[in-house]
Curated annotation (Swiss-Prot):
Cellular component terms per the entry's GO annotation: extracellular space
Matching InterPro entries: Interleukin_8-like_sf (IPR036048)
Keyword Kinase annotated: no
Family classification: Belongs to the intercrine beta (chemokine CC) family. Highly divergent.
Keyword Ligase: no
This protein's name: Putative CC-type chemokine FPV061
One biological process term in Gene Ontology: immune response
GO MF: chemokine activity
Alphabetical keyword list: Cytokine
Ranges that cross the membrane: none
Length: 129
């Protein structure tokens, strides 16, 4: 009886270690792996990298100065306070701003000569998902 339990335990452990789901992308550093969250402030982002081939979640990995990694995708641009600045500041994130599923569209307002705009309306940014 004890040997049957041991074989069962080894079988369960073995199937966990050789699960193709885990081996393909679950633990890869170049996939999102559930690292979603609010978009960090742009001055805290040190690096921006597109997710790797074969990842189930296409997006961009933002690494911050606090050594945290966040993944943002087209459906997540409304999270955080700074999504509109990421593509402008980091050139390797510029792919987020093109194509039918682009993340950001900008609408610039015109102002009468000699009148300075308020801080709230310098760039009227519209986020489109």
């Amino acid at each position: 009886m004890q040997s049957n339990i041991s074989i069962y335990v080894l079988t369960v452990i073995g199937s966990c270690f050789y699960n193709p789901f885990i081996l393909t992308y679950e633990c890869r550093d170049d996939c999102c792996n559930g690292r979603y969250g609010p978009v960090p402030a742009p001055w805290k982002v040190l690096n921006c990298t597109k997710t790797g081939p074969g990842c189930p979640d296409s997006g961009y990995l933002l690494t911050t100065s606090e050594n945290k990694t966040y993944c943002i995708t087209g459906n997540e641009t409304d999270k955080g306070n700074y999504p509109q600045t990421i593509g402008a500041i980091f050139p390797n994130c510029s792919g987020m701003n093109v194509g039918a599923g682009r993340l950001i569209t900008r609408m610039l307002e015109e102002y009468p000569r000699g009148k300075s705009p308020s801080n709230n309306s310098i760039n009227n940014i519209k986020i489109s998902c």
